[in-house]
Amino acid sequence: MKVAIIGTGNMASGLANTLAGAKHEVTLGSRDPGKASALAEKIGLGVRGGGITAAAKLAGVVILAIPFGAAADALKEAGDLAGKVLVDISNPISADYKSLLIGHTTSAAEKIQALAPKAKVVKAFNTIFAQLLPAEARQGKSLQVFVASNDEAAKAEVSALAQSIGFDALDAGPLSNSRFIEPIGEMNIHFGYFLGKGTVVAPAWVAV
Ligand SMILES: NC(=O)c1ccc[n+]([C@@H]2O[C@H](COP(=O)([O-])OP(=O)(O)OC[C@H]3O[C@@H](n4cnc5c(N)ncnc54)[C@H](OP(=O)(O)O)[C@@H]3O)[C@@H](O)[C@H]2O)c1
């Protein structure tokens, strides 16, 4: 798949590495194009880097790997996303990581859909710590990625993307279910940072 990743931080770098390793065509986009080019060069594996507009233009799937609060600016820079799959991986949390800033009647994913009404927004990966993106860090364990969207084809595409890098994609229903998935991400952060488990844990839905 042709994937644009907006951002050059922990998630952007981990996703770019893993996705490119699985033979996806990855372009990093940053508000500082030089930073994206430098990261792309460091990763290798055919990853390219540049500005946000150029990266988004080349791709069918655009992953926003930036803080939720930066989404409006980045989407403005991304330009026309009509018909593209837009993946929201964010946890809309406070600066101290301890609480969610959005919830109950909406979610970060729904806000992003409102900002990019012609894109097909998919919520995914918000419950996976960056440290667990490299396959070797998962030590053979199959971790679940909860995937929510109002567009079934987009959901299938992002599920295939997650599966191609060794995750178990779980259909989590419509985009409005992000109201429930984002609190799970926040609970995971509490386990990872405040309850002593470290950033090597991930939630899973278990059937008996
Ligand atoms: N880290 C995790 O384990 C984890 C797990 C699940 C989900 N998430 C979510 O993934 C997203 C990224 O997290 P991260 O840990 O990778 O963050 P990070 O390492 O702090 O990187 C954030 C990136 O966002 C960019 N950015 C910030 N403001 C921007 C703006 N106004 N316009 C364009 N780009 C902007 C930064 O660019 P500059 O370098 O130019 O400042 C940087 O590349 C967040 O929404 C987070 O909630 C993170």
Model-found features: residue ranges?
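NAD(P)+-binding Rossmann beta1-loop-alpha1 motif at the extreme N-terminus of oxidoreductases
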Residues: 1-45
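Rossmann-like NAD(P)-binding element
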Residues: 44-96
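General beta-strand structural signal in soluble alpha/beta enzymes
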Residues: 49, 120-125, 170-172
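Rossmann-fold NAD(P)-binding glycine/threonine-rich loop
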Residues: 90-137
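Active-site-lining helix/loop region of Rossmann-like oxidoreductase modules
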Residues: 143-208
